[in-house]
Amino acid sequence: NSSDLGDFSCGPGNGSSEGPTPSSQHPNSSQLYVWDKRDSPSWEPEPVCAPPRGSLNENLTQDLTVALGSTLWLSCGVPPAHVTRGPVSWTQVHPKKPDSTLLSLYLREKPPVQEMWVLGPVLSLSQVTVQAAGTYYCLRGNLTTEIHMKVTARQAVWHWLLRSGGWKVPAVSLVYLIFCLGSLVVFLQIRKALVLRRKRKRMTDPNRRFFKVTPPSGNGTPNQYGNVLSLPTPGSSTGRTQRWAAALGGTIQSYGNSRSDVQETGAMGSRSPTTAGIEEEEGEGYEEPDSEEGSEFYENDSNRGQDQLSQDASGYENPEDGPLGSADEDSFSNESYENADEELAQPVARTTDFLSPHGSAWDPSREATSLGSQSYEDMRGILYAAPQLRSLQPGPHHEEDADSYENMDNPDEPEPAWGGGGHMGIWSTR
């Protein structure tokens, strides 16, 4: 115990540098030599002699030789014997300096479980545990410092993130996820812009505004807008007209009676069933042109088809009246579609059962009840049958099928004259 050491100088009466006296019963204290890199002692301490017998209870002596810059662990006592209770103090004795007390501690029943360092007035605790919690007092002269310390247990995950560098794993994962999401958003935006650009380019391209239709053999010649229409035949003109109107999304209002439309459709179906199927496929490929250049391919040449149209119209003529004048054949005026008198009756026509397997689908003997011949007008590139009006004499056979016709208000009233001569049927647009 160095605190019990008294005068360590070896005088002539206490001893010499050669060693202890032979009569001494106590071991001598050791000398501490500090060596530098040149393997020479930095200083030569004087020999330390044992204190008087009465001043020591027990003396343990050790000889230590260390190199310059080494770390020393000086143990007070021989392991594993530890002081469990009582005061502990360390005092440094230098031959050329006065004695200095390094550390004074009073140990309790439970020794501290962590390392403690004293650096001047500072107490250093390394690897603090829960047992280190409590109140610490520091006495320095007349000043007393009281410190209350509370130790909180840190979660294992948080400890792993901070002490083991585990925070790098979630940080890198988060950065990678943000990068992937950003790349995906940029890719979708670029793809959307490219799709819109292709659509805009396709819509503005004049070569792609119309369908490329391959013409059937013998039905027309190809062009950039589709097929050039051939002249209508007697059996397919009406069906083709109706299909053109359906393909263009328009609705052609029929100004003739129902018998004429039904008989024409029946006659077309019975005479040329294969032609109607071909024309139906052909009609679906047409599209209405936006310019006048495209519409000229759909024009009807009235001069070339005049003979054929005359044949079609021959079955619709009324034998009682003569042919219309040249003024009536030129064109249709708007007056033909207006109702001059809402009270006048609409002409009545008699239908024929065209679905019956017996008999003809067209009865020429009853043509007196139908309206006049058809004339063909060209409107927006579409050919349709424009009926001409003929006088109609009501008879007793008209009342038999009165429920099958429209606008049977007053069939017996007189009809106004057409163009100053003959009779004119009044049409209702209702």
UniProtKB/Swiss-Prot annotation:
Q: Which cysteines are joined by disulfide bonds?
A: 10-49
The keyword Transmembrane is assigned to this record: yes
Compositional bias (Acidic residues) spans? 278-299, 327-344, 401-415
Superkingdom, taxonomy of origin: Eukaryota
Q: List the subcellular locations.
A: Cell membrane; Membrane raft
Q: Where is the Ig-like C2-type domain?
A: 1-17, 52-152
Gene Ontology terms: biological process: antigen receptor-mediated signaling pathway; B cell mediated immunity; B cell proliferation involved in immune response; B cell receptor signaling pathway; B-1 B cell differentiation; immunoglobulin mediated immune response; positive regulation of phosphatidylinositol 3-kinase/protein kinase B signal transduction; positive regulation of release of sequestered calcium ion into cytosol
Show the segment(s) annotated as Disordered.
1-56, 206-241, 255-374, 387-430
Stretches of the chain forming a coiled coil according to its record: none
Q: How does it sit in the membrane?
A: Single-pass type I membrane protein
Glycan-linked positions: 1, 14, 28, 59, 142
* Residues exposed to the Cytoplasmic side: 191-430
Q: Which GO terms describe its cellular component?
A: external side of plasma membrane; membrane raft; plasma membrane
Transmembrane residues, as ranges? 169-190
Side Extracellular, residues: 1-168
Q: How is it modified after translation?
A: Phosphorylated on tyrosine following B-cell activation. Phosphorylated on tyrosine residues by LYN. Tyrosine residues are phosphorylated sequentially after activation of the B cell receptor. Phosphorylation of Tyr-405 is extremely rapid.
Q: What does this protein do?
A: Functions as a coreceptor for the B-cell antigen receptor complex (BCR) on B-lymphocytes. Decreases the threshold for activation of downstream signaling pathways and for triggering B-cell responses to antigens. Activates signaling pathways that lead to the activation of phosphatidylinositol 3-kinase and the mobilization of intracellular Ca(2+) stores. Is not required for early steps during B cell differentiation in the blood marrow. Required for normal differentiation of B-1 cells. Required for normal B cell differentiation and proliferation in response to antigen challenges.
How is this protein named in the record? B-lymphocyte antigen CD19
